[in-house]
Amino acid sequence: MSRIIWKGAITFGLVNIPVVLRPASRSQTLDLDLLDVRDMAPVGYQRINKSTGKPVDKEYIVKGYQYAKDEYVLLNEEDFRQANVEATQTVDIVSFVDAQSIPPYYFDTPYYLEPDKRGERGYALLHETMRRTGRAALALVVLRARQHLAAMLVHGDALVLNTMRFADEVLPISELRLPKATTGKPTGAHAREIEMATKLVEDMSEDWEPEQYRDSYRDDLMARIEEKIDSGKTHQLTPPAEEEEAPRQGAKVIDMVALLRQSLGQRGKEDKEDATPARRKAPARHAAARKQPAAKRAATPPAKRASTAAKTKRAPAKRESHAPAARKSSSTTRRKHAA
């Protein structure tokens, strides 16, 4: 089922029937792109200044109405806003006419009217009344910010809403050069011809079955496309320049994530080391001790601690912590000499 494009109500007199509107048609036209045969890149469109032949940026394009030769009235967004009709969310029935009296070329786009649960009774009442009287309802409805004239018709169990062209949008038939239908005139039809044509019409008459009629041009073209696909006669599309940048942008995002992850890991490592300074200091002393002979370890303990402090680049506050140990060592040496 097609999607709902509008919600509102049918109104006539004091009757209000809640309904939704669904498209009753769909386009089956093949979507073909324009390509440059040299590299199979898509071909875009540009807006060209007809005087200079140069492309025009969007910011410099305005809309204007030509009221005389080379004379224009410019229109801005405010002009269009003031011209827009208010969306009333109603299908306002203004009159009923004989359904057979509407010329088919007035019809434009068909829609299905479907009642919601609150409107089922009123919908059935309007449908049955129009069916019995053979009438069509003429209504006004606002769709996509534009007011439309519409004809509501009975079709099976449903009510169908056809948007219509206004009278000034339809060219008058009087402008055509048509033969007179008077029998016996050179431009008219003779009785014998009418009789034979009537017999031919009867022989060709059949029930209306729209499924048996198809767009043969579309079907043949689609069959040709499928043949080319099956035989491998396809071409790789060259992506536009802006699409080529997409992978590089993705790579930058991935690299940034990797850098952030490394930064978080380094930050966690530093936090862990700051929380356990004693454990970090001890391995440094042991490593220095393993590099020195046993005799030198006993002879110069202060120098080793100073070297260890230099390697680990301690803050001033932590370097000062070695001073008491050095003074204690000197004091112990003096006491030994005194003894």
From Swiss-Prot:
SUPFAM superfamilies xrefs: SPOC domain-like
Coiled-coil ranges per UniProt: none
Keywords: DNA damage, DNA recombination, DNA repair, DNA-binding
Pfam families noted in UniProt: Ku (PF02735)
Residue ranges occupied by any Ku domain in the UniProt entry: 10-187
Comp. bias regions, Basic and acidic residues: 267-277
Function noted in UniProt: With LigD forms a non-homologous end joining (NHEJ) DNA repair enzyme, which repairs dsDNA breaks with reduced fidelity. Binds linear dsDNA with 5'- and 3'- overhangs but not closed circular dsDNA nor ssDNA. Recruits and stimulates the ligase activity of LigD.
GO molecular function per UniProt: double-stranded DNA binding
Biased composition (Low complexity): 290-310
Keyword Transmembrane helix: no
The family this protein is said to belong to: Belongs to the prokaryotic Ku family.
InterPro entries: Ku70/Ku80_beta-barrel_dom, Prok_Ku, SPOC-like_C_dom_sf
Classification lineage: Bacteria, Pseudomonadati, Pseudomonadota, Betaproteobacteria, Burkholderiales
Designated gene of the protein: ku
Gene3D superfamilies cross-referenced by the UniProt entry: 2.40.290.10
Biased composition (Basic residues): 278-289
Assembly mode: Homodimer. Interacts with LigD.
Organism annotation: Cupriavidus necator (strain ATCC 17699 / DSM 428 / KCTC 22496 / NCIMB 10442 / H16 / Stanier 337)
Name of the molecule in the record: Non-homologous end joining protein Ku
